[in-house]
């Protein structure tokens, strides 16, 4: 009888201590954000600052995003999405030449990337190279997407690029 009671107490103590241990601390199962993910968050925030007419705050976010994207691109090279955002942030910071280089690197990986083709087309319009913008539009022609219509309107002068 005493043995059964002692065993019951020991089992209870063991179960209670394990339940407390299971609830304490971080199990490591939560996924931490990558530099790419953090950069995308900064870009979204920067776009919101632009909508609120806060260009200095937007620029700071684009700068932070660009630094994170450069790090991400070094660690995981040849990702079209990373190169798209690198082109975008670089262009937003006024460096059209290097922005174009990032876009072209991305197109070398995925020539039909919708975002890169649209943004590169917008860059070409902004730098008065309409013939090259039309080439990007032709790539988007069959996509049945908003990006095609936006770029078409920008090339036609019916819409001003928001980027």
Give the residues covered by each predicted segment.
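Residue-level recognition of tetratricopeptide repeat
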Residues: 79, 113, 145-148
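Terminal, low-structured helical/coil segments at or just beyond the last alpha-helical repeat
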Residues: 24-33, 134-163
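Structural marker of alpha-solenoid helical repeat scaffolds
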Residues: 75, 109, 140-143
